Regions:
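Small-residue-rich segments of transmembrane alpha-helices in multi-pass membrane proteins
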Residues: 1-2, 43-58, 100-115, 172-188
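Intramembrane alpha-helical segments
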Residues: 2-5, 11-12, 16-56
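Helix-coil boundary and interhelical linker segments in multi-pass alpha-helical membrane proteins
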Residues: 2-15, 51-72, 115-140, 186-189
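C-terminal ends of transmembrane helices
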Residues: 23-38, 81-99, 153-168
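Alpha-helical membrane segments in multi-pass integral membrane proteins
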Residues: 44-52, 70-83, 96-121, 135-152
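C-terminal transmembrane-bundle signature of multipass membrane proteins
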Residues: 108-189
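Hydrophobic alpha-helical transmembrane segments of polytopic
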Residues: 16-23, 74, 143-146, 176-179
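Membrane-interfacial loop-to-transmembrane-helix junctions in polytopic alpha-helical membrane proteins
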Residues: 8, 12, 33-40, 63-66, ...
Length: 189
């Protein structure tokens, strides 16, 4: 009902329907194939979730500015990495190839964040942000720090677990909340 009311008030939102149909179709296909916890299903769910940022911007403004796409991209990269990392701790905990993939993925996140931070510091990407250049630059460097922390934990926590550390799914989730908070703060600036 809420979706119908929203579309009635802002019919231009229907432009998003095909995108969400594809993304959610992938997730549903994985459920039908009895693989609701697959990496593909998780990524499809992340994409659907982070696309809500530009959808919300579109709803409010009637258009989408660069910061909404920046948020969606960085949140998508971060949360996909979280799925990969959690798999190394639970379903793929003894899979060294998956652990290597996770560490490599998180290293790429650091690199992408670093490129944006350097470009922000040089004033190249200031057009993305409605905020002042200083806050935009600070936020991008905080994102580099959050990405580096996520890279470190993608290596250190599985290593700790392998060496006998007690890492229950609950503990993994609770510690991940701190990293997620760091990413959110960095993006909010």
């Amino acid at each position: 009902l809420a979706a119908l009311i929203t579309v009635a008030l802002r019919p231009s939102l229907l432009v998003w329907a095909p995108v969400f149909a594809i993304v959610m179709g992938v997730a549903l296909w994985e459920v039908v194939r009895k693989r609701p916890r697959s990496l593909l299903s998780g990524i499809a769910t992340v994409v659907a979730s982070v696309l809500m940022v530009p959808v919300a911007d579109h709803t409010i403004r009637g258009s989408i500015n660069g910061i909404a796409w920046w948020w969606a991209l960085m949140l998508g990269i971060y949360f996909t990495g979280t799925i990969i990392y959690v798999k190394t701790m639970i379903r793929e905990r003894n899979n060294s190839r998956y652990l290597t993939f996770s560490i490599g993925y998180h290293a790429a996140f650091v690199l992408i964040s670093l490129v944006f931070a350097v470009l922000a510091s040089c004033g190249v990407v200031t057009g993305f942000s409605p905020y002042t250049r200083l806050w935009w630059t600070v936020g991008t460097w905080l994102l580099v720090i959050a990405a580096a922390i996520s890279l470190f934990r993608s290596w250190a926590v599985p290593r700790s677990a392998h060496n006998g550390g007690k890492w229950t799914p609950k503990r993994v989730g609770k510690t991940e909340q701190l990293v997620a908070l760091g990413v959110d703060i960095a993006l909010a600036l």
